């Protein structure tokens, strides 16, 4: 892949060194398959997570445009909103977050703990809405109101998932390929697929760098029919930005997110407990727990293309564990 195509985009350096790519010996023994994990849960800011890779590009663009305010949206327990607020604090910017309660709970822990608690620490301005039914339009309307108050807002989409933000996961694919080179031939890569930027960025990068590896997105909020166009559209938009072709098939599994986004399920919580007990690594109930449930079931159901090593992309999210107590 021509690296110069990535380097022409302004980017802030938040992460520094590559995040670890580790072998999981006890988990591998338990599953009877070599399992590796990419530790994007340990990126440096605000208790870690994958969105920081996207924010390196998005925040750089905001500064280039002269913005003094970052505006974004998500669930009350959004990891993306938490990381955006932290970046705003680090850069001396105002942050306005449009939040919804997707599970309709009145549980105090969900409404005040976990990521929501951290938003207060980052001095985030919170705006609540009934539902993010049309988040792009709702964010633009909020930006207009904020601008009328004298601020210079920059809108970051839900999950940081546009073509610019997703470049962070093309960059991640480069990192993964370099870490695997001469060390391990990964057969399959598993990632949670939600707002689709992480999945689409990896799809573009891995197609060119590790073409023999299949990439599987485990959906956390939508059926394959609803999620596929989101990932494909972003995949093509990223490729256009980089002047590359992107023809890799997008593979999605939608068997593991029921009963819905943000609602824990038994398989996901078992996966959270299993990795904690075997490896001391924390997953979360919303994204990585469900994605790991897909990996575990995928092995038992022989859904992977072969029996080679599997890489799990750990996108973070552990702060939500505290909000979902006592489900945990």
From Swiss-Prot:
Keyword Lyase attached: yes
Entry keyword set: Lyase, Pyridoxal phosphate
EC id: 4.4.1.15
Cofactor(s) it depends on: pyridoxal 5'-phosphate
Reaction(s) catalysed (UniProt annotation): D-cysteine + H2O = hydrogen sulfide + pyruvate + NH4(+) + H(+)
Xref: SUPFAM superfamilies: Tryptophan synthase beta subunit-like PLP-dependent enzymes
Domain of life: Bacteria
GO biological-process terms attached to the record: D-amino acid metabolic process
Assembly mode: Homodimer.
Stated name of the protein: D-cysteine desulfhydrase
Gene: dcyD
């Amino acid at each position: 892949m021509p690296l110069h195509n990535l380097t022409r985009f302004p980017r802030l350096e938040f992460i520094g060194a590559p995040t670890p790519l580790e072998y999981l010996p006890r988990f591998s023994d338990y599953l009877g398959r070599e399992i590796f994990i990419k530790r994007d849960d340990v990126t440096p800011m605000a208790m870690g997570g994958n969105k920081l890779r996207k924010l390196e590009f998005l925040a750089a663009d905001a500064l280039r445009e002269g913005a003094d305010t970052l505006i974004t949206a998500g669930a009350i327990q959004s990891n993306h909103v938490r990381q955006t607020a932290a970046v705003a604090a680090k850069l001396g910017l105002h942050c306005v977050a449009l939040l919804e309660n997707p599970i309709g709970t009145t549980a105090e822990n969900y409404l005040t703990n976990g990521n929501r608690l951290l938003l207060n620490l980052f001095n985030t301005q919170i705006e609540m809405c009934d539902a993010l039914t049309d988040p792009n339009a709702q964010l633009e309307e909020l930006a207009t109101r904020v601008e009328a108050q004298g601020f210079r807002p920059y809108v970051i989409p839900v999950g940081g998932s546009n073509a610019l933000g997703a470049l962070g996961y093309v960059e991640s694919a480069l990192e993964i390929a370099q870490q695997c080179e001469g060390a391990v031939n990964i057969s399959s890569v598993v990632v949670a697929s939600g707002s689709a930027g992480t999945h689409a960025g990896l799809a573009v990068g891995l197609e060119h760098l590790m073409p023999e590896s299949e990439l599987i997105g485990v959906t956390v909020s939508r059926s394959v029919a609803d999620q596929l166009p989101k990932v494909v559209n972003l995949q093509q938009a990223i490729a256009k930005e980089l002047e590359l072709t992107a023809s890799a098939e997008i593979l999605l599994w939608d068997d593991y997110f029921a009963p819905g986004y943000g609602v824990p399920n038994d398989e996901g919580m078992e996966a959270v407990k299993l990795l904690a007990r075997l490896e001391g690594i924390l997953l979360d109930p919303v994204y990585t727990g469900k994605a790991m449930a897909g990996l575990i079931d995928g092995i038992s159901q022989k859904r992977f293309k072969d029996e080679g090593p599997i890489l799990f992309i750990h996108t973070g999210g552990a702060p939500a564990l505290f909000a979902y107590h006592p489900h945990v």
